[in-house]
Amino acid sequence: MSEHLPEHRHVRLAEIAGTAGVSKATASRALRDPESVSAASSAKVRQALAILGAAGQTPYAESGTREGSGAGAGSGAGSSLIALIKPAVSAGNVDPYSRLAEILTNRMFGLGIAVVHIEAIAERNEALLETILGSEHGGPTISGAVVVGGGAAGVLAGMLAERGLPLIRISNARHDDGISRIYLDATGGIETAVAHLVHLGHKRIGLAVLRDSAAPARIAGFRRSMAGILHIPATRDQAPVVEAAGGAMAGVAAAEELLDLRCTAVIACAPSLSFGMLEAAQRLRLDVPRDLSLLTVGDVPDADVVQPPLSQVVYDWATVAQSAIDEIREMIAAGDARVHVDYTVDPDLVLRASAVPPQRR
Amino acid sequence: MKVTLDEVAARAGVSLATVSRVLGRRGAVAESTRAKVLEAMSELGYSRSTLLHDAPRRLVAVSAPGNPEHWQVQVCTRVAKALQDHDLLVTRPLVETDPEPLQTAIEAGAVALVTTTMTSLNTEIPCIRVAEQSATEEVSEAGTEVIAARLDLGGGMTTAFEHLRAIGHRRIGLICNDSGELAVQLIRRFLAEHPARNLGLNLEDWISRVPKSFSGGSRAVLELKDATCTAVIVQSALQLHGALHGLRNRHLQVPRDMSVVGFGDSPTMKFTGPPATVLGLDVEGLSNALIDATLQTLRISTTGLPSVPPVFRPRLVARTSTTAARQ
């Protein structure tokens, strides 16, 4: 059966001519002898080859493209690319790493490194792996990757590491996968958040976390902080925790559950959960911060301009991004002699206006 | 009658991306799916004469301008995801504010640019973008620009004006960016559709061109307040946040003292003080138009584009930042 596969290996001349907007005769001459046609036509044909992904593929195109312009149209040989891999975020959900990805992208482009953006999806990872590493099918070569976040991106990172691509992960869970990593340790941040809320006078403090691989460490950290700071047994009853799925609606449900438990303050561990809290408060006609104090661990978009401005436990993304870029460049340069790195980054508390002393309730 | 890959995909009940993977023998396709696709091809009599080839690995730039609006980021993300499903590599340099990142991407081998900016970027590679509905731009000489969709800003302005006029506003101002094609077109449509345009007033007094920034917004809204405007339309989300802040600082209340309409929706618009009334864009429709045009340009899909690009008219999402004008 396989020999009857209707496969297409070569780009036809008519197609090149059509894409370039020149006649077949011109295209043919441009490919064989670029000197024989006008510079404009030659450029058009080179571009068509790049668009069709045929640069360097058609036997006689090779010499044509190289001679035509020294810069080399399309094949991109020689320039290094670094992949930036993130888990795909479903429509309507909030991406907790958008700010970090933006800084990474802009800094790398600032250094003259082109960034290839990959959104990892569990069921597409096999195909993505081939796309990332398959430079024998033409197109640019990717020399390393920065992997932000977990989930499908973490799985893809493992697959890429097995194939020997230099990698660095930035994630909020720690695994023994042998991949270099910058670990965003939220437990310290949660402790700071608890201490701040207790200092304001809150006693019933709830935690909302996403149900992911980072959740157990966060819940344990929260319980430990509550027990240590408030001197209470950190039971389910005294230190309520809600685990939520992704998405704003799950955030709303988690918020309603915590409000039912008469919490006066909530620590939300993801931006989608914070938006859920705000939405739930709006629905119940509760005022943030008067009726409910809210602290977010992580990055809520526009946190400084919404009403009220949200207090946050955030990482210094600029430093994290710069370290990741420095490390990955070093790893690429070192080749097989690269050293394993493992940092832990603690977040800082940024106080705005969403947490105040408890008023009633 | 030529059989297209889209028909094959429909017959096999799989996506176009899967069909191209089967054809190109690239990526992972389940054996059962592969068989289904091949069966559909033989049933339909698909012949290899179509333009599709073995989907070579290519790099495509998907770009928003610096400090992008939320809708621009959303559209870019959707486009990037769809192109990735066709086994293309995606790079997302910022454009418009700084030419360097795009140049880096082109040197790295980007073969086309898909962008949500309306400004013509004069790229050497094909540029697939959005334009204003009535904008008549000359097609660049190299023919590298593809207009995939048109935004009906005039219609959007009319919607905003109708909403504000229905609740008694006449003195309506505009806060827009001090550069960029979107601002130019917004001003044009503002002057053309303004309810007070025939009253012999100088409408220019009610337009404030400021940088796309928080402080720009606060400054502009107070200027327009002093110019006796009772309502403003704001181009950028940053300016909108700034405007709300500026009014609050002056101890003015939104919407009692000033009604505010934003351009482009985002999750945070629900939680501004007060929740902002905005002109929302059809992010999904815009994304799909850009995706279709890109696949066409790269000769991945051959269904043919509509001869006239689809037009998208912004829709009003009413929240609580607008209210009846005080007499």
Where would I find each of the regions flagged by the language model?
Chain B
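N-terminal helix-turn-helix DNA-binding module of bacterial transcription factors
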Residues: 1-56, 326
